[in-house]
């Protein structure tokens, strides 16, 4: 073979010039030229073809991923990425929705089978069913369907609960006669409600059981210390609490029977569920912020000691008790004694002149806090309160201190007398910058206090 037609870049020879020209236009030759520029050895035709096939395969995979589309009928979602679709299929939410979807499908299948069996039933004599009897059977089928749906939504206080297979099996009668004699209603019966209450009452927590976990203790005080140390339980208005055991009994009943969270009042399906919620969310405190929440616990508190007239009423009670000891202890007092002396009880009372001023027995007057901006004003004394001689003396002194004399006195008081003007200006600017820095720090502290978004702060030492 003649070697006059060869490609030194790819190290191949050709029979004629046409083959050589076609080779020079090929991708293989162009690729080897780039490798030659990069000081790399050339590739053979087989290796280059393998690289082309691998690149085409990768492009097909990328195109396949770009055209990916899947629809989840259970969750009613669309996915355009294989990773997102696989993650969704493995998620707990999808599994829960799938179980609900399958359960609803079984219920619908049972309902359709029962309705079809009742509609196609015939009399025992083999005669066709009359139109009126067909309508009666259809009404019965609809009632059975509503009963199955009501069992799926049966709850004590509006909470949803899932029916078991045995309940669905027993709710559908086996014979036509039993179906006619046993008609159901959509609302739960009082017997079912009492049974549910009895079941929950059997799980009621005792005073020695922790409200937030499964721990149990030998005494109520030990249990209370555990809840305070381990779960940060805080009892609001402890100084006014008069019936602490009853309060904890009510909280235990709210958690173990009502399955309700103490903080957010959210209802759950079981005791374990509400405990897990309170531990995960940190809802281990008693809700006592709104007026309704305070009224809910008002039976366990007594706030009479916080009333302003509580001390006066206590004194009156003591006086009445002392006076009712016996009729022989009474003495006649003349009318003059009433005018000459005041009752000690009346002197202890503080008369209120109006709603903005309080007159104390000592003669002082206390103003209302809403008028504090006026009480803090430092007003100059009026000239009428000073005699004529004093006013003349003040005018003479004011004239004497006017102008340069006043400036010199101010300089002496600020210890800058005899200092050059440049030094004075520097001192004044330094004082001004210090005042500006102080204002900035005060503003920063004020904004920090104002923007503190922590809603609740209760010191454990103040309980």
Swiss-Prot record:
GO terms, biological process: nucleocytoplasmic transport; ribosomal large subunit biogenesis
Q: What is its main location?
A: cytoplasm
| Any one cellular-component term (Gene Ontology) | cytosol
| Molecular functions (GO terms) | nucleic acid binding; zinc ion binding
What are the start and end residues of every segment in region (Disordered)?
A: 109-136, 155-189, 317-341, 444-463
- Compositional bias annotation for Acidic residues: 317-338
Q: What Pfam families does the database record attribute to this sequence?
A: zf-C2H2_2, zf-met
Cross-referenced InterPro entries: Matrin/U1-like-C_Znf_C2H2, ZN622/Rei1/Reh1_Znf-C2H2, Znf622/Rei1/Reh1, Znf_C2H2_sf, Znf_C2H2_type
What are the Phosphoserine sites (modified residues) in this protein? 150, 155
* Polar residues: bias regions: 113-124, 167-188
The alphabetical list of record keywords is:
Cytoplasm, Metal-binding, Phosphoprotein, Repeat, Ribosome biogenesis, Zinc, Zinc-finger
> Which Gene3D superfamilies does the entry link to?
Classic Zinc Finger (3.30.160.60)
Spell out the subcellular localization from the entry: Cytoplasm
Give the protein family.
Answer: Belongs to the REI1 family.
Role played: Pre-60S-associated factor involved in the cytoplasmic maturation of the 60S subunit. Involved in the dissociation and recycling of other late pre-60S factors before newly synthesized large ribosomal subunits enter translation.
Subunit description: Associates with nascent pre-60S particles that have not yet entered the translating pool, and is released from mature 60S subunits.
What's the protein name? Cytoplasmic 60S subunit biogenesis factor SPCC550.15c
């Amino acid at each position: 073979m003649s070697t006059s037609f060869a490609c030194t870049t790819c190290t191949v020879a050709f029979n004629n010039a046409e083959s050589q020209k076609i080779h020079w236009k090929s991708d293989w030759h162009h690729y080897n030229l780039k490798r030659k520029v990069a000081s790399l050895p050339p590739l053979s035709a087989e290796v280059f073809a393998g690289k082309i096939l691998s690149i085409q395969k990768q492009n097909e995979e990328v195109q396949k991923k770009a055209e990916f589309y899947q629809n989840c009928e259970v969750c009613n979602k669309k996915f355009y990425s294989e990773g997102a679709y696989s993650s969704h299929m493995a998620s707990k939410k999808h599994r829960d929705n799938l179980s609900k979807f399958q359960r609803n499908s079984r219920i619908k299948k049972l309902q359709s089978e029962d309705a079809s069996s009742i509609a196609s039933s015939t009399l025992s004599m083999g005669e066709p069913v009359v139109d009126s009897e067909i309508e009666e059977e259809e009404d019965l089928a609809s009632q059975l369907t509503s009963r199955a749906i009501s069992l799926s939504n049966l709850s004590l206080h509006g909470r949803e609960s899932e029916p078991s297979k045995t309940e669905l099996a027993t709710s559908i009668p086996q014979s036509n006669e039993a179906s006619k004699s046993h008609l159901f209603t959509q609302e739960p019966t009082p017997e079912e409600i009492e049974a549910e209450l009895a079941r929950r009452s059997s799980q009621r927590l005792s005073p020695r059981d922790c409200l937030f976990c499964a721990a149990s203790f030998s005494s109520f005080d030990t249990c209370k210390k555990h809840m305070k140390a381990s779960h940060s339980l805080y009892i609001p208005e402890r100084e006014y609490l008069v019936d602490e055991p009853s309060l904890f009994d009510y909280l235990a009943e709210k958690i173990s029977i009502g399955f309700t969270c103490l903080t957010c009042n959210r209802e759950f399906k079981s005791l374990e569920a509400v405990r897990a919620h309170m531990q995960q969310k940190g809802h281990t405190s008693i809700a006592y912020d709104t007026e309704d929440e305070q009224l809910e616990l008002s039976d366990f508190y007594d706030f009479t000691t916080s009333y302003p007239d509580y001390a006066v009423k206590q004194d009156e009670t003591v006086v009445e008790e002392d006076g009712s000891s016996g009729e022989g202890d009474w003495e006649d007092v003349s009318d003059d004694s009433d005018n000459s002396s005041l009752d000690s009880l009346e002197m202890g009372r503080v008369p209120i002149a109006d709603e903005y001023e309080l007159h104390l027995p000592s003669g002082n007057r206390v103003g209302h806090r809403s008028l504090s901006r006026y009480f803090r004003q430092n007003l100059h004394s009026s000239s009428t309160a000073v005699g004529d001689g004093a006013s003349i003396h003040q005018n003479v002194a004011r004239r004497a201190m006017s102008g340069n004399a006043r400036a010199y006195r101010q300089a002496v008081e600020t210890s800058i007398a005899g200092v050059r003007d440049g030094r004075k200006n520097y001192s004044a600017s330094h004082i001004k910058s210090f005042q500006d820095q102080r204002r900035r720090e005060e503003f920063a502290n004020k904004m920090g206090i104002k923007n503190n978004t922590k809603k609740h702060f209760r010191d454990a030492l103040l309980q």
